[in-house]
Amino acid sequence: MKEQLNQLSAYQPGLSPRALKEKYGIEGDLYKLASNENLYGPSPKVKEAISAHLDELYYYPETGSPTLKAAISKHLNVDQSRILFGAGLDEVILMISRAVLTPGDTIVTSEATFGQYYHNAIVESANVIQVPLKDGGFDLDGILKEVNDDTSLVWLCNPNNPTGTYFNHESLDSFLSQVPSHVPVLIDEAYFEFVTAEDYPDTLALQQKYDNAFLLRTFSKAYGLAGLRVGYVVASEHAIEKWNIIRPPFNVTRISEYAAVAALEDQQYLKEVTHKNSVERERFYQLPQSEHFLPSQTNFIFVKTKRVNELYEALLNVGCITRPFPTGVRITIGFKEQNGKMLEVLSNFKYE
């Protein structure tokens, strides 16, 4: 057994609504607002696509997801040879880490970001440098100071999970210009579709300028397919060729591929969902207490407080399951009614 596994623990999901009801003696409905899922669900066309292909379940998937690859290639205007799919971004991160890292290698990322960058590096016996956040966001200058010719991977999450903050195009361009050209910079844009900031990076354009800039996106968030597990990376043809050796032959299921293609084709539905999210998100920042909220470009808001357990339980008491962290609580933006209940709690809560 790998000794470094002793440094890690298996992922622990939050308690189910039923378990929470029993623990806290809560009556009535509970809403799961802890995992940043798209509560509106996928496009109706996704359900139609799934129903149309149920008779194919006994077939193995087509390896490499060629139908979805062609759709993504057209959507992003990138060559198919530069795209690799995984069963969610979790698997994409795992494949890249497994392909690149050897014992003693070093990755550089941030503290308080998506935990799978750290997790998979430790599994591969690599060292992890985690730079503290600055004003709740990635400190690109601080990360740059830790990067050198021997760095194996740099992981950036934009917008960042769990804080919701982002860095802009100019900042990323400047950062990439100073990273050694052979050091891969992985930019995780899982929440890209929710972004409304005009100065958010055009990472695809930056890829034309920097061969070591690699882009990750997913169908789990705005497209509403978290239960079907489809994520992908857009990288250099050479990197994809090598990483593809690591990919399990049938990692993305046949139904998942059909569903993702249907979701991608219904951009009007995506626009409707992301617009609803931005409208509801703005309601939180209209509160006088929003000084305690980190600025978000996602479908969640990070609320800073020293009284984490008290806030978590106060939100739970109005039927909203959220996600506590050491320095605050992450709230998935819900429907109007759910948000109204949370806004009432947040407007009366004592944060210090």
Curated annotation (Swiss-Prot):
Pathway membership, UniProt: Amino-acid biosynthesis; L-histidine biosynthesis; L-histidine from 5-phospho-alpha-D-ribose 1-diphosphate: step 7/9
EC number(s) reported in the record: 2.6.1.9
PROSITE patterns membership: AA_TRANSFER_CLASS_2
Cell inner membrane is among the record's keywords: no
Modification sites for N6-(pyridoxal phosphate)lysine: 221
Cofactor(s) of this protein: pyridoxal 5'-phosphate
One Pfam family linked to the record: Aminotran_1_2
Catalytic reaction equation(s): L-histidinol phosphate + 2-oxoglutarate = 3-(imidazol-4-yl)-2-oxopropyl phosphate + L-glutamate
InterPro entries from the UniProt entry: Aminotrans_II_pyridoxalP_BS, Aminotransferase_I/II_large, HisP_aminotrans, HistidinolP_aminotransfase, PyrdxlP-dep_Trfase, PyrdxlP-dep_Trfase_major, PyrdxlP-dep_Trfase_small
A GO term for molecular function: pyridoxal phosphate binding
Keywords: Amino-acid biosynthesis, Aminotransferase, Histidine biosynthesis, Pyridoxal phosphate, Transferase
UniProt enzyme class: transferase
GO biological process: L-histidine biosynthetic process
Family: Belongs to the class-II pyridoxal-phosphate-dependent aminotransferase family. Histidinol-phosphate aminotransferase subfamily.
UniProt cross-references to HAMAP family, sorted A to Z: HisC_aminotrans_2
SUBUNIT field: Homodimer.
PANTHER family to which the protein is assigned, alphabetical: HISTIDINOL-PHOSPHATE AMINOTRANSFERASE, HISTIDINOL-PHOSPHATE AMINOTRANSFERASE 2
Protein name as catalogued: Histidinol-phosphate aminotransferase
Gene source species: Staphylococcus aureus (strain MRSA252)
The organism's taxonomic lineage, starting at the top: Bacteria, Bacillati, Bacillota, Bacilli, Bacillales
